[in-house]
């Protein structure tokens, strides 16, 4: 079993790495992920990656491992930055055609290898994009907007504000019509 640390290769042959049961471990700067960058506050930081290539008991070339990162996102509730921790598990089976995907064990997600060598950062970036929340938000207890969202409305202050300005409610006529029926 070969083991490469720190510097991950740009291109890989996933089938060869699986046959040799290789382990790739290292970091990748966030700035290298072009599709991920637009959803991030900034592209500083690194992604930690551990990938274990193998051929399973059924002869399926596969990779398992983890991707860890701290991604700076914009909370859609308060529009402030928050750090979103990602620890994404990977369990992919390398396939050459969509037909092969039908016979895979359920524990694997199929990954169609259309070109060989494969760009490793594309695989990592795909997994990171899948790990992102649909609507990024702080936890309610940490979000500054929560005090406005959960604030109970004081109905008496609204009525007194209308009376102070001397404005008549335009829907009060409808209330009178309802009473006549």
Residue spans for each PLM region:
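A positional/architectural concept
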Residues: 1-72
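Charge-rich, low-complexity linker and terminal segments
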Residues: 1-21, 87, 94-181
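Hydrophobic alpha-helical segments of small multi-pass membrane proteins
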Residues: 69, 89-92
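Short cysteine-rich clusters marking metal-coordination/redox-active sites
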Residues: 75
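Conformational-control "hinges and anchors"
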Residues: 78
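Cys/His-rich microdomains that often coordinate metals
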Residues: 82
